[in-house]
Amino acid sequence: MELATRSQIPKEVADIFSAPSDDEEFVGFQDDVPMQNLSESCGSLDSRELEKQQNVCFRSKYFTEELRRIFKEDTDSEMEDFEGFTESELNMSSNPELMESELSDSDKAYPVMNDAEEDDEEEAAPRRGRSTRRSSFGLRVAFQFPTKKLARTPDKDSSHLLDSKTDLRRKKSSRQPKGKEDSASDAEDESRAESQENSDALLKRAMNIKENKAMLAQLLAELNSVPDFFPVRTPPSASRRRTPRRAFSEGQITRRMNPTRSARPPEKFALENFTFSATKLTEELYSFRRRKTISGGKCQTYRRHRISSFRSVKDITEEDLENIAITVRDKVYDKVLGNTCHQCRQKTIDTKTVCRNQSCGGVRGQFCGPCLRNRYGEDVRTALLDPKWTCPPCRGICNCSYCRRRDGRCATGILIHLAKFYGYDNVKEYLESLQKQL
């Protein structure tokens, strides 16, 4: 920073600094320090006013009785006195740019300080405050410059701050290896304790095993001493020993898949011998013919009986007619009391037809209402009241699965819907139309 003007310090200002104090005389400025350097530092602090004035003159109105009283007062500390400026402080005052850079560096370094540095700085703060106030107090009162804040911190304070920072860093760096050493020592102690515990557990386990083995051996010895617990077994005699079976090495032995059992009945159990010899057969035929000739040639004939009961028209009651099933929903299934229909083979309790043919009987002539109407176009009520009615099997028109299979034909299945689709009332007419077309 270039100074606008350079002027010498007036005589009055020099007299103030050279005047003796209460406790110790002020020796004055050193001889080796030129007065021109001090004047340059003063001019740098008041650069704004010096730019406007080429010839700066000292104004005596600033030196009042109060100013003189302030300089004559005792310092803050009785043990510490002001001994004047050193050469480094004077050089610092001659280079204001260096002062500003150090001040800015110190201001930037303050936020980065940790808690430990703040604690250490709080202890050093009273001393710095006193020295700062003492060193900058005279300049502030003597010169009344507007830029006094820039040059308020001297080199001594900055050097003290730097020394304190370096000491704190050294302490911090010394603490870190100590902390690492402490953690390493703690880990070693823990590992030693664990190994000691493991060794103690293994030792205790070995002792327990040894004690258990000794106790078991003692118990076995006591049991062996009592003969009742362990009776002596005599080896079997040589005569009772079974002779080992001879192994067959000739040929391959086939595995028995179905071995014989003691509970299985013998072969040909409950079987009759139907084989006849020729002589015995001729004897039987001869005896049969002889009996026939003795009886006069008339053989006894047996009358064929109907399996089912024959019911005439007079035996049909009104209750039987009301019990006729018109649709499939009217049919009630009963496997005990019901009778079977020849067409559908379902055992129901509804009234069915009765064939009037003397040679027909049983299930052959029984048809339920839905089957007789859909398959043949007839009514059960009319069939029961007709004394000459015969069943479809007797007439040779039965189209059930059994009768068609007997005739060498396949079963038709449910054809009533298809027959009605083509305009026929029953399956018999539909099958007859198909037979005519073929």
UniProtKB/Swiss-Prot annotation:
GO cellular component entries: cytosol; fibrillar center; nucleoplasm; nucleus
Cross-link Glycyl lysine isopeptide (Lys-Gly) (interchain with G-Cter in SUMO2) mapped to chain: 210, 213
Basic and acidic residues composition bias: residue spans: 152-167
Location of the protein in the cell: Cytoplasm; Nucleus
GO biological process, any: regulation of DNA-templated transcription
Post-translational modifications reported in the UniProt record: Phosphorylation increases its interaction with PSIP1.
Motif (Integrase domain-binding motif 1 (IBM1)): 9-33
InterPro entries to which the protein is assigned, alphabetical: CDCA7/CDA7L, Znf-4CXXC_R1
Region (PSIP1-binding): 56-115
Keyword Transmembrane: no
Residue ranges, annotated region (Disordered): 74-199
A Pfam family the protein falls into: zf-4CXXC_R1
Region MYC-binding, annotated ranges: 201-223
Main localisation: cytoplasm
Motif (Integrase domain-binding motif 2 (IBM2)): 63-89
Sites bearing Phosphoserine, chain numbering: 21, 77, 101, 104, 135-136, 159, 183, 185, 249
Keywords attached to this entry: Cytoplasm, Isopeptide bond, Nucleus, Phosphoprotein, Repressor, Transcription, Transcription regulation, Ubl conjugation
Protein name, entry field: Cell division cycle-associated 7-like protein
Higher taxonomy: Eukaryota, Metazoa, Chordata, Craniata, Vertebrata
